[in-house]
């Protein structure tokens, strides 16, 4: 893959083989984020788990202290009073069967998170094959199947994100934008790492945090020393 001039220049700013403290790593990532737009800062954490085993799955949610920097569109499946509650709490789209039909017929994905009341899951279940692969299916573990719609919507809008380990044993999450600056990014980074560490499955053996890498949208990866996160 051909790399751009800015990317290659960025590589000269640090030692790609070295592991840095979280403080130093964020400094470097900000220096290497040279694109002409407000780049997202991404975190990739490789875990010492085997995701093929149900007892070694790692997933959860965390509210980023400073949000993600992007406005999140929330779709809510609810009826009656609960639909009114969702609208009042700031949901972008609220509906029931008619939204299921829209998603099935129009391949409609103009939203980032889907929330549903438990009584609607029979209806939403029809969308499993469509929403599932995109990670959009409501789930009680991530707090997106709930009757407390106001709390769920407000947390999501405030910067609540879901993390889950992929087939390769890696968690990928955004921790904010370049424009946040070092302190806010550091606080978001540490909030995510704290949540991932607390999610360690009892069945996971050996070293849990194998590697931690920070990068901007267009920039190179910077390694963080797992012993120098906090």
UniProtKB/Swiss-Prot annotation:
It comes from the Bacteria. Binds directly to 23S rRNA. The L1 stalk is quite mobile in the ribosome, and is involved in E site tRNA release. Belongs to the universal ribosomal protein uL1 family. The lineage of its organism: Bacteria, Bacillati, Bacillota, Clostridia, Thermoanaerobacterales. GO terms for cellular component: large ribosomal subunit. PROSITE patterns: RIBOSOMAL_L1. This is Large ribosomal subunit protein uL1. InterPro entries: Ribosom_uL1_bac-type, Ribosomal_uL1, Ribosomal_uL1-like, Ribosomal_uL1/biogenesis, Ribosomal_uL1_3-a/b-sand, Ribosomal_uL1_CS. It comes from Thermoanaerobacter sp. (strain X514). Keywords: Repressor, Ribonucleoprotein, Ribosomal protein, RNA-binding, rRNA-binding, Translation regulation, tRNA-binding. GO terms for molecular function: rRNA binding; structural constituent of ribosome; tRNA binding.
């Amino acid at each position: 893959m051909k790399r751009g001039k800015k990317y290659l220049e960025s590589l000269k700013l640090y030692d790609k083989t070295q592991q840095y403290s979280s403080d130093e790593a964020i400094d470097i990532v900000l220096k290497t984020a040279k694109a002409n737009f407000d780049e997202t800062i991404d975190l990739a954490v490789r875990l010492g788990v085997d995701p093929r085993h149900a007892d070694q799955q790692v997933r959860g949610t965390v509210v980023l202290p400073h949000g993600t920097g992007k406005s999140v569109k929330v779709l809510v499946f609810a009826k009656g009073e609960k639909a009114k509650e969702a609208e009042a709490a700031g949901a972008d789209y609220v509906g029931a069967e008619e939204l299921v039909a829209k998603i099935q017929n129009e391949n409609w994905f103009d939203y980032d998170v889907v929330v549903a009341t438990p009584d609607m899951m029979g209806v939403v279940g029809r969308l499993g094959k469509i929403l599932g692969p995109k990670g959009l299916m409501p789930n009680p573990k991530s707090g997106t199947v709930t009757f407390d719609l106001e709390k769920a919507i407000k947390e999501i809008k405030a910067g609540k994100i879901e993390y889950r380990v992929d087939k390769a044993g890696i968690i990928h999450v955004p921790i904010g934008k370049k424009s946040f600056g070092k302190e806010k990014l550091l606080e978001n980074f540490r909030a995510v790492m704290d949540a991932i560490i607390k999610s360690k499955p009892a069945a996971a053996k050996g070293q849990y945090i194998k590697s931690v890498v920070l990068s901007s949208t267009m920039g190179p990866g910077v390694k963080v020393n797992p012993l120098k996160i906090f």
